[in-house]
Amino acid sequence: MSTKNNSNVPEISDEEFYKNRLLTVTEQLKDNVQVYPHKYEVNYRFKDIFTFKDASEEDLKKVKVQSAGRILNFRIHARYSFFQVMSEDFTIQLVVDAQVLENKDIISNIKRGDIVGFSGVLGRTKTKEFSVFIKELSILTPCLRTIPTDYYGLKDPEIIYRKRYLDLLINKESKNRFIQRTNIIKFIRKYLDDKDFVEVETPLLNIIPTGAAAKPFTTHHNELKMNLFLRIAPELYLKKLVIGGMDRVYEIGKLFRNEGIDLTHNPEFTACEFYMAYADYNDMMNMAEEMLNGMCKYLHGSEKIVYAPNKREKEVKPVEINFARPFARFHMLEELSKVVGIKLDGLNINSDETLDLLIETCDKYEIKVEQPKTLTRVLDKLVGHFIEPKCINPSFIIGYPLVTSPLAKNHRSEAGMVERFELFINGKEICNAYTELNNPIEQRMRFKMQAQDINDGDDEAMITDEDFCVALEYGLPPTGGFGMGIDRLTMFMTDAANIKDVILFPAMKPESDN
């Protein structure tokens, strides 16, 4: 049996292929050919077709299907042609008999990447491959450009991030990673819904950029004639809802921070925050353990995972991460006391002498701290150097001085400290939580402390929100609050070494700027 020209991989350049295909489509449109039909009736999705895979030959012949998908590969022969068609996560073979097909010309017109509609009956070939034996075949959407082949794949990070649609078509690993991301969010929602939390939405455009220590994005509202800020955190809005009687609330949504981009930071990212009345940070720790342990078992069937990032980041070595409870705990000041040689506590940490000692320690270990060298910034750098690398398995860092946490409640037994923790996995922050400060008098004092840092040049210090202080005067019950970055968590759950690999369309410079 003779074989005609196989156009799986064009023998001409990509540009020539594009020009030729565009010319063909343009001429068809001029001739009023329906190149892009409005609709195509699908009576069986591919996953439904595959439910018949083990049926008998006699039963298969009774199943008439009409479906659609994208051409991956094909072989054209004198009479029989074979097309591999993909839809969602399934690929099926179409067997086309030129003597049966009404529109025979279509066979020579089909190119790799075309989206086709087809109808026929199910069956098996002589080699027992489950297939659809075609009666009708039509092109629903022509592919005007060449798609990279499975053999060579799509490996250039620039193309992967800028043309995610190609990445999803070619790299099954990428598609599975984003499906897992969806599963992670579904798990979080179900976990909170099952505990009677109510999902809410709070504004993305804020008058005051507060709720976290970060640089905001600025925009302008033409009608109101005022500048607004993209939210850096929904925290204060959510606590207002608790004041309003919504005892358990959560939000999953976008946050924006006008800061650097690296392997674990993107200026637009997704987070989950929840607030629970009559709870404290101990309850938040229990819930963090319960949620992450359950999520790991749900996604991987085990409490342990081997974080083996994708091969593009060759310097990242596989690491075993154990989500078994209880998670480890590191007290910030106790750990740093071992480094600086004196006992640090919530009282002496605020002295000028202690700050000088901490700065000297940074200099000794060549730890860079940007100006102004506030206590909060210095502690953050020291924790990042000495404590975070110990947190391979999920670990809580507790023991935060009051000055570092303007929205957290004073510690009930450690003077000068607050009831706060941050959860780290493989040395990266995933969660931040605390017993919420609900004393309006104390909250105003904390905001004044932050205002002093702003005056000293700290552009990440928190801005005073008087409206929130007024809301606190109506009474916020004892409350535990929790925030978690979904992108970083997804990285560890899906073997991604770069945060861009878990964000469908990450922030990128325009190609003309490169």
From Swiss-Prot:
CDD domains: LysRS_core (cd00775), LysRS_N (cd04322)
Family: Belongs to the class-II aminoacyl-tRNA synthetase family.
The protein's enzyme class: ligase
Species this chain originates from: Vairimorpha ceranae (strain BRL01) (Microsporidian parasite)
Gene Ontology, cellular component aspect: cytosol
GO annotation terms (biological process): lysyl-tRNA aminoacylation
UniProt keywords, alphabetically: Aminoacyl-tRNA synthetase, ATP-binding, Cytoplasm, Ligase, Nucleotide-binding, Protein biosynthesis
Subcellular location: Cytoplasm
Recorded coiled-coil stretches: none
Descriptive protein name: Probable lysine--tRNA ligase, cytoplasmic
Catalytic activity: tRNA(Lys) + L-lysine + ATP = L-lysyl-tRNA(Lys) + AMP + diphosphate
GO molecular function, one term: ATP binding
Assembly information from the UniProt record: Homodimer.
PROSITE patterns, per database record: AA_TRNA_LIGASE_II
